[in-house]
Amino acid sequence: MSTNNSDIRVVVGMSGGVDSSVTAHILKEQGYDVIGIFMKNWDDTDEFGVCTATEDYDDVIRVANQIGIPYYAVNFEKEYWDKVFTYFLDEYKLGRTPNPDVMCNKEIKFKAFLEHAESLGADFVATGHYAQVKKVGDEIELLRGVDNNKDQTYFLNQLSQDQLKKVMFPLGAMEKTEVREIAKKAGLATANKKDSTGICFIGERNFKQFLSEYLPAQPGEMRTLNGEVLGKHDGLMYYTIGQRHGLGIGGDGEPWFVVGKDLKENVLFVEQGFHHETLYSDSLIATDISFTTNAAKPKTIECTAKFRYRQTDTKVTVHLREDGTAEVVFADPVRAITPGQAVVFYDGDICLGGGTIDTVWKNGAKLNYVG
């Protein structure tokens, strides 16, 4: 790089975890002008001490002091509520299964946070995501992280060129074990901290209990597709396509799985057997299609896709439609595609972009996954 790194200001999103701690440490070691920012996205004052925000910020302070960088906490609660949490609840009301991580990256970490960082004179923002960016001509490509088990491009699929041109992912070329090793060698306070899992604003709390605080549950009948009533469900929002646990159906034979929802009648459909035919589909319609590059796209794209995080890729043909949606046709049937989740497109290691799964189809007929 022709410019001296000390002239380049990088604002790091620090969560109090090991990944973002090592990100800040690496950039500081490389001579960048580094500032750490802790994003406070959720108001935990009305909770019962479960949220770890204060503890996490203490860890940010400890690490920032260890590596010698300034740090701040910035409140994005309003933006998070408006852009992420409201979407989260709206999707559940529609009987779908949302992906708040995708929306958080699009609207908070690489929008509200990026704008704030720029107000501090940032040339780039950096996070602890396991993904890579690569300049090719005038464009920035988003590439999978080297650690296949940790690759997070699935959650970054909605990022635009304007956002990608401003980001650094120092951990993208590393395995998670290397990151822990660096943290230990550097003596970082978070070196042995457990990775956070699940949805950040729910934390360790019971999911059903949390959701019922915001959306009234409406119990109803649990039926087979032939109309046989097998019991009661606790509320359609608590169930997702392909779910097995928590159905409370006894008896012998193969386990039961969720195969559909009827919102109007408030009925949950279940069938027996992991490989029940209703769980398999051959295509889907996706909305909110977004691409990571500005290059012109052909109407038909042959690529691979992921329908959930850490799933192996499936060969697909994507047909872009005039209304901004896409029909995604699978080379082989896929099990338990879930409306509301992200479908993400890849060309080898390049993440092309993605969209939101809206409807799921088989042999030209729409499956009643949410209807």
Curated annotation (Swiss-Prot):
<keyword id="KW-0963">Cytoplasm</keyword>
<dbReference type="InterPro" id="IPR046885">
    <property type="entry name" value="MnmA-like_C"/>
</dbReference>
<dbReference type="InterPro" id="IPR004506">
    <property type="entry name" value="MnmA-like"/>
</dbReference>
<feature type="region of interest" description="Interaction with target base in tRNA">
    <location>
        <begin position="99"/>
        <end position="101"/>
    </location>
</feature>
<dbReference type="Pfam" id="PF20258">
    <property type="entry name" value="tRNA_Me_trans_C"/>
</dbReference>
<comment type="function">
    <text>Catalyzes the 2-thiolation of uridine at the wobble position (U34) of tRNA, leading to the formation of s(2)U34.</text>
</comment>
<feature type="binding site">
    <location>
        <position position="128"/>
    </location>
    <ligand>
        <name>ATP</name>
    </ligand>
</feature>
<keyword id="KW-0694">RNA-binding</keyword>
<keyword id="KW-0819">tRNA processing</keyword>
<keyword id="KW-0067">ATP-binding</keyword>
<feature type="site" description="Interaction with tRNA">
    <location>
        <position position="341"/>
    </location>
</feature>
<dbReference type="InterPro" id="IPR023382">
    <property type="entry name" value="MnmA-like_central_sf"/>
</dbReference>
<keyword id="KW-0547">Nucleotide-binding</keyword>
<dbReference type="GO" id="GO:0002143">
    <property type="term" value="P:tRNA wobble position uridine thiolation"/>
</dbReference>
<dbReference type="GO" id="GO:0103016">
    <property type="term" value="F:tRNA-uridine 2-sulfurtransferase activity"/>
</dbReference>
<feature type="disulfide bond" description="Alternate">
    <location>
        <begin position="104"/>
        <end position="200"/>
    </location>
</feature>
<dbReference type="Pfam" id="PF03054">
    <property type="entry name" value="tRNA_Me_trans"/>
</dbReference>
<feature type="active site" description="Nucleophile">
    <location>
        <position position="104"/>
    </location>
</feature>
<dbReference type="Pfam" id="PF20259">
    <property type="entry name" value="tRNA_Me_trans_M"/>
</dbReference>
<dbReference type="GO" id="GO:0000049">
    <property type="term" value="F:tRNA binding"/>
</dbReference>
<feature type="active site" description="Cysteine persulfide intermediate">
    <location>
        <position position="200"/>
    </location>
</feature>
<feature type="site" description="Interaction with tRNA">
    <location>
        <position position="129"/>
    </location>
</feature>
<dbReference type="GO" id="GO:0005737">
    <property type="term" value="C:cytoplasm"/>
</dbReference>
<dbReference type="InterPro" id="IPR014729">
    <property type="entry name" value="Rossmann-like_a/b/a_fold"/>
</dbReference>
<feature type="binding site">
    <location>
        <begin position="13"/>
        <end position="20"/>
    </location>
    <ligand>
        <name>ATP</name>
    </ligand>
</feature>
<feature type="region of interest" description="Interaction with tRNA">
    <location>
        <begin position="308"/>
        <end position="309"/>
    </location>
</feature>
<comment type="similarity">
    <text>Belongs to the MnmA/TRMU family.</text>
</comment>
<dbReference type="GO" id="GO:0005524">
    <property type="term" value="F:ATP binding"/>
</dbReference>
<keyword id="KW-0808">Transferase</keyword>
<feature type="region of interest" description="Interaction with tRNA">
    <location>
        <begin position="150"/>
        <end position="152"/>
    </location>
</feature>
<dbReference type="InterPro" id="IPR046884">
    <property type="entry name" value="MnmA-like_central"/>
</dbReference>
<keyword id="KW-0820">tRNA-binding</keyword>
<protein>
    <recommendedName>
        <fullName>tRNA-specific 2-thiouridylase MnmA</fullName>
        <ecNumber>2.8.1.13</ecNumber>
    </recommendedName>
</protein>
<feature type="binding site">
    <location>
        <position position="39"/>
    </location>
    <ligand>
        <name>ATP</name>
    </ligand>
</feature>
<keyword id="KW-1015">Disulfide bond</keyword>
